[in-house]
């Protein structure tokens, strides 16, 4: 009986030492991940030699499904991996951006797709000379499609100012923030194989600047069609630059025009307002666990 008592005491002392501790989960090495994102942005065989604009578009679109009335959608969950979001016509071509980032995800599995895609958007903007974007980690990846938003939530580029305002109001933006966010059209280009539209908005599609507003105000625009697709867009005089109908609506609507004129004259103001609006975009719908 005494032996049993002593044995129980010894086991009580040793049992914490004999228990296998849970595996140590280290946070993702964000600085290394940022460095690796930067290395994939420059590429010779795509567009103007940069993936930064399309990676910015990936971050934008994975956030822009948010609905403030239901608090659904947004970047949390990385739902663009699932049907129907992956098939939304507004997301055509984004497989290029996702594929470019996939090796980074495989090397650093601790980072969620949702964090990786949004972080890559921040890095892309800064890489192109844009403002510093505040980014916070903590997004999770959903394991199934139950929370995947329906299609049709992204802005349609052939619509009018009412559509723009309705879409951005759903996201929680006012007119100023809306015009600031659309200024991202200053980088990248349209691809007829993805959207049916073709061409670039500015002469510096790899440089983040206020040129979208400058070009929108100062060029002479005429409506035309993309021959291969029949899609209507606007061309400048020498047809080297384009605008979409939603872009033109920014100078037809008085409230939007007010901010277009301000940003065309004041790039630091645009950078400040864009940085704030984009950081807000990245946070839409995020629910972080607190300890």
Swiss-Prot record:
Necessary cofactors: heme b
Top-level lineage group: Eukaryota
Family annotation (SUPFAM superfamilies): Heme-dependent peroxidases
UniProt-annotated binding residues for heme b: 185
Cofactor binding mode and count: Binds 1 heme b (iron(II)-protoporphyrin IX) group per subunit.
Enzyme class: oxidoreductase
Location of the active site: 61, 201
Keyword Iron: yes
Keywords, ordered alphabetically: Heme, Iron, Metal-binding, Oxidoreductase, Peroxidase
EC number: 1.11.1.-
Entry's Gene Ontology molecular function annotations: heme binding; metal ion binding; peroxidase activity
Protein's GO biological process: cellular response to oxidative stress; hydrogen peroxide catabolic process; response to reactive oxygen species
Matches recorded under Gene3D superfamilies: 1.10.520.10, Peroxidase, domain 2
InterPro entries xref list: Ccp1-like, Haem_peroxidase, Haem_peroxidase_sf, Peroxidase_I, Peroxidases_AS
One Pfam family matching this protein: peroxidase
Site (Transition state stabilizer): residue numbering on this chain: 57
Family recorded in the similarity comment: Belongs to the peroxidase family. Cytochrome c peroxidase subfamily.
Biological role: Destroys radicals which are normally produced within the cells and which are toxic to biological systems.
Protein name per Swiss-Prot or TrEMBL: Putative heme-binding peroxidase
Biological classification of the source: Eukaryota, Fungi, Dikarya, Ascomycota, Saccharomycotina
């Amino acid at each position: 009986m005494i032996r049993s008592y002593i044995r129980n005491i010894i086991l009580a002392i040793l049992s914490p030492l004999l228990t296998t501790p849970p595996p140590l989960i280290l946070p993702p090495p964000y600085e290394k991940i940022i460095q690796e994102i930067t290395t994939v942005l420059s590429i010779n065989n795509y567009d103007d030699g940069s993936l930064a604009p399309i990676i910015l578009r990936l971050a934008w679109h994975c956030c822009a499904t948010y609905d403030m009335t239901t608090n659904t959608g947004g970047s949390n969950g990385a739902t663009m991996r699932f049907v129907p979001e992956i098939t939304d016509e507004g997301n055509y071509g984004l497989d290029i951006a996702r594929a470019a980032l996939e090796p980074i995800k495989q090397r650093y599995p601790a980072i969620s797709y949702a964090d990786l895609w949004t972080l890559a958007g921040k890095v892309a903007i800064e890489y192109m000379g844009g403002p510093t974007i505040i980014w916070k980690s903590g997004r999770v990846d959903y394991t199934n499609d139950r929370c995947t938003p329906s299609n049709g939530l992204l802005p349609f580029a052939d619509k009018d100012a009412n559509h723009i305002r309705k879409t951005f109001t759903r996201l929680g933006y006012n007119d100023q923030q809306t015009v600031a966010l659309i200024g991202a059209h200053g980088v990248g280009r349209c691809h007829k194989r993805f959207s049916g539209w073709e061409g670039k908005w500015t002469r510096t599609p790899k440089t983040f600047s206020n040129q979208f507003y400058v070009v929108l105000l100062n060029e002479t625009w005429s409506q035309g069609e993309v021959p291969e697709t029949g899609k209507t867009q606007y061309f400048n005089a020498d047809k080297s630059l384009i605008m979409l109908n939603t872009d033109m609506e920014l100078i037809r609507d008085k409230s939007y025009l007010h901010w277009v004129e301000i940003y065309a004259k004041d790039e630091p103001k645009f950078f400040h307002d864009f940085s704030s609006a984009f950081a807000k975009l990245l946070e839409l719908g995020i629910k972080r666990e607190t300890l």
